[in-house]
Amino acid sequence: MSTTPASQALVTVPPVRRRLLWTLGLGAFGLAFSITTTAAYLPPLLHRFTSSGGLIGAILGAEGIFALTVSPVVGPWSDSFHTPLGRRRPFMLVAVGPMGFCLLLMPFMPNLWTTVVIVMSFFFAYYLFETPYRGLYPDVLPASTFGRSQGIQHIQRGIAIGIALVVGGLLFKVWQPSPFILASILTTAACGLTILLVREDGGHGHVFEGFWAYIQRSWHIFWEDGDVRRFLLANSAWEGAFAAARTFVVLYIIDGLDQSKVLSSAVLGAVATGYVIAAIFAGRLGDRFGLARVIFFASFIYGGGFLAAGFAQEWHDWYFGFITAVSIAGGTVMTLAWGLLYKIVPVEHRGAVSGLATTTKGIGLLVGAPLAGLAIDLSRPYLSATNGYQVLWPICGALILGAIPLLVRLMEIEPRSKTEVPLL
């Protein structure tokens, strides 16, 4: 037989291809490690300067503003930025140093406002790196590997999150600045290796067209390309659900179900386990059966699981199996989402659309968590058994299930390459 099934491709692809997939994923490792460290250990540091939970939440939530403002400019700019170093890597190179430097300084700031300046600078550098990094994938990989490449990327993301939470937590108890120092070293090394080891086509004569021109181009694509618009709307729903769940899951377990912090850590471990399992297998399934199709069916389990969780008012140990299964479905959706975007976006607009997709992440950060928080406050008098927290899950479920109709059209137009994987 002259073709190679995508489900076997991870075994049969030559070492050069495997190395490229894992080398690209190092960027995701660095990004995940840095943002997880910031989200987990910055609030205790800020608590030294303020007791206002609202202010601390606003500082962390400002990440969404940078996703909304930086990405639509940097994405299309990188499409036209032709240099001997390539289109994407110059932006990544500019960002990697400030990311590491800000992480290193973050725990040593003497007051709230200097800390805020460093945190905002980190968020700016983070999205300056992430947007062209996302656009680098379709530039250097064939479409037949998009599913597996995202699976490998999310395996590395899962490893980074696990190390940041477990090892970082132990280090934080010993010396509070130590997780940030570790994050600075690993983020700089991992992201730097991606820049160093990945090669993209060079060029000459880059032209800066102006920030407003790039913003206009991004939103012109949004309104003119219906398929890209469908994906971006679906991605907003996925990111909104993820942001809401990430923000309130621990409070749901501790305050809503009256359980210990130890149990909440165990639940997060079950979620991480499901995420890694999905990352291992989702890419192969997506390349074989179609990314949109796999996301479509996984969304029913993902969203349906959230809806079912809304009925829980007390803890049972069998929830661990349920949580792991739903996490596998959710991890499948999140793993394959960017691979699907890479398949449907026009080649000349990859950077711009990557910027728009990152912008939808910002919308999720700015809308998903506050909306869920407001719903919890309003539901508290009526859902007293869980202090209102159980309303979180139907909201997340509605967002996931609401995106399913958008996938029907994407299943029809997704380029199919399951029968053959080029052995380059």
Language-model features and meaning:
Residues 147-169, 360-369:
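Glycine-rich segments within core transmembrane alpha-helices of 12-TM secondary carriers
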Residues 40-55, 247-263:
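Short amphipathic helix-loop junctions that connect adjacent transmembrane helices
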Residues 128-141, 332-346:
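Intracellular juxtamembrane helix-capping segments at the cytosolic ends
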Residues 107, 189-198, 394-424:
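Multi-pass alpha-helical transporter architecture, strongest
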Residues 2-17, 201-233, 423-424:
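Juxtamembrane intracellular "pre-TM" segments in multi-pass secondary transporters
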Residues 71-85, 278-290, 376:
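Helix-to-loop junctions at the C-terminal end of transmembrane segments
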Residues 87, 170-185, 374-399:
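A membrane-interface helix-boundary motif in multi-pass transporters
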Residues 93-110, 300-314:
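C-terminal ends and interior cores of transmembrane alpha-helices
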